Amino acid sequence: MRIWWLLLAIEICTGNINSQDTCRQGHPGIPGNPGHNGLPGRDGRDGAKGDKGDAGEPGCPGSPGKDGTSGEKGERGADGKVEAKGIKGDQGSRGSPGKHGPKGLAGPMGEKGLRGETGPQGQKGNKGDVGPTGPEGPRGNIGPLGPTGLPGPMGPIGKPGPKGEAGPTGPQGEPGVRGIRGWKGDRGEKGKIGETLVLPKSAFTVGLTVLSKFPSSDVPIKFDKILYNEFNHYDTAVGKFTCHIAGVYYFTYHITVFSRNVQVSLVKNGVKILHTRDAYVSSEDQASGSIVLQLKLGDEMWLQVTGGERFNGLFADEDDDTTFTGFLLFSSQ
């Protein structure tokens, strides 16, 4: 900053010299304030090359380089001199098997070998064909007398002999053929009154009501509507028919199916004899079954639902019926 003030003073003084003939030197002025920083100068020239630095520490080993290309085969070296025999070295490791060599030529035929031992007996061969017929041999000597031959055929009938004496009386002959039917005889006397024949009877027909429809499963169905049960062979309290007359019976059942599927079985003494099933679709369906059975005294028959409450669609109301019937065809007494 001082340099700028100095230059300014010199410029003023020079102006005054031009305007006046003489100039007196004044007192030094007050130093001015420092000026602003000048612009950066240009880069200097490169200096001289410095001394060689110390050797750096060894770097980390580099990764192995790629294998170089194989060199050309060298020329055969000169034969070595034969030296004294060295000490026998240790046995080397076994080398890998070499490749199979080419097949050798066939050698000359060897001499005949010695006879071998007799081998075991072979299996029996198949039967050979029949050979040709040989020439007829000479006639042999006469053999011993043979046994007596069988009787010869019957000879012709001889002449009739003289009449013999009368024999004894023979047995009575078989009855003769039945004769022609005779004339109708007179009316006989009236007989006595016979005993009245009483035929055994057993029959029933029962049905369901509004109260007993949709019965429980796996138990006898208790039909509470009595259509015919004169001899009380069907027990409405337990839902079973009991045989009082041994014989052959006919059983049948008619079912109105509504709202649910139906699956029932006709049971004899706990054994299911006849099965009927109907899948309900819409409106009302009908299902039935019938059978003829031989029963003994005391046998029990009943109808029951099987398969659970999904199959108890047996229906009854004022216009629809579900019935169970059984009756005796003939007795075996």
Swiss-Prot record:
Gene3D superfamilies on file: 2.60.120.40
GO cellular component, one term: extracellular region
Disulphide connectivity of cysteines: none
Region (Disordered): 24-189
Low complexity bias spans: 26-40
Skewed-composition ranges (Basic and acidic residues): 42-55, 69-88
Domain Collagen-like span(s) in chain numbering: 24-82, 95-154, 155-191
Compartments reported by the entry: Secreted
Signal peptide: 1-19
Keywords for this protein: Collagen, Repeat, Secreted, Signal
Free-text tissue specificity from the UniProt record: Expressed at low levels. Not expressed in adipose tissues.
C1q domain ranges (all copies): 197-333
SUPFAM superfamilies per record: TNF-like (SSF49842)
Subunit structure: Interacts with CTRP9A and ADIPOQ. Forms heterotrimers and heterooligomeric complexes with CTRP9A.
General function of this protein: Probable adipokine. Activates AMPK, AKT, and p44/42 MAPK signaling pathways.
PANTHER family: COMPLEMENT C1Q AND TUMOR NECROSIS FACTOR-RELATED PROTEIN 9A (PTHR15427:SF21), EMILIN ELASTIN MICROFIBRIL INTERFACE-LOCATED PROTEIN ELASTIN MICROFIBRIL INTERFACER (PTHR15427)
Full protein name: Complement C1q and tumor necrosis factor-related protein 9B
